[in-house]
């Protein structure tokens, strides 16, 4: 009977020890893991076609270049990322145009940064309708016409004379165990 009790106590001690070891952090210095960082470095015009009036459809291809940094000693895996692209129509007034999503796994070693380029295509025939449907009242209140705003964006994108904003950004790392939000704008002020 005493022997069974000793065995029972040993089993419980082993289970408790295993549970505590399993809860230890993976960081070498005993610290907790820090979330990775996602920062917009720049926006590039990847492909440009001169604006043409409707019913012509003119694509505008933009590349959003991000710096994804891992402040930890152990590698992390970026598995999914999405964000909303907005253009500035008047100072401080941005309108959402697209939400690109990336489903590519990218490993970032500890204490390093990787560059991620996300390419998205905007359509000059779709953008005015998008503005009218999603932000029609706001566009009218600002005294703007969707078609004119889109024409100006297409004609001035090369100089980035208006702001481009990424918002509602979410990056998912390590099988959704780490979720990082981000937003930023370009050109940098």
Segments (PLM) and residue ranges:
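Intrinsically disordered, low-complexity Pro/Gly/Ser/Thr-rich segments with frequent PxxP/GP/PP motifs
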Residues: 91-142
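Bacterial Sec signal peptide processing site at the extreme N-terminus
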Residues: 20-40
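Hydrophobic core residues within well-ordered beta-strands of beta-rich domains
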Residues: 60-62, 81, 114, 164
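Short acidic, flexible loop segments centered on an aromatic residue
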Residues: 73-93
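Short, solvent-exposed beta-strand/turn "edge" segments of beta-rich domains on protein surfaces
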Residues: 46-61, 69-77, 107-110, 157
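Sec-dependent bacterial lipoprotein signal peptides
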Residues: 1-23
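Terminal connector regions
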Residues: 122-189
């Amino acid at each position: 009977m005493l022997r069974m009790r000793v065995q029972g106590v040993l089993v419980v001690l082993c289970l408790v020890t295993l549970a505590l070891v399993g809860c230890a952090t993976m960081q070498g210095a005993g610290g907790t893991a820090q979330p990775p960082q996602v920062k917009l470095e720049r926006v590039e015009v990847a492909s440009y076609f001169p604006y043409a009036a409707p019913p012509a459809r003119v694509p505008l291809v933009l590349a959003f270049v991000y710096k994804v940094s891992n402040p930890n000693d152990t590698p992390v895996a970026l598995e999914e990322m999405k964000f909303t692209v907005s253009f500035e129509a008047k100072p401080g007034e941005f309108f959402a145009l697209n939400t690109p999503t990336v489903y590519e796994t990218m490993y970032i070693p500890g204490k390093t940064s990787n560059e991620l380029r996300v390419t998205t295509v905007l359509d000059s025939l779709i953008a005015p309708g998008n503005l009218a449907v999603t932000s029609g009242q706001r566009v009218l209140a600002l005294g703007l016409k969707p078609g004119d705003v889109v024409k100006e964006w297409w004609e001035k994108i090369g100089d980035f004379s208006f702001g481009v904003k990424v918002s509602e950004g979410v990056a998912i790392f390590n099988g959704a165990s780490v979720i990082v939000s981000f937003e930023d704008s370009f050109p940098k002020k």
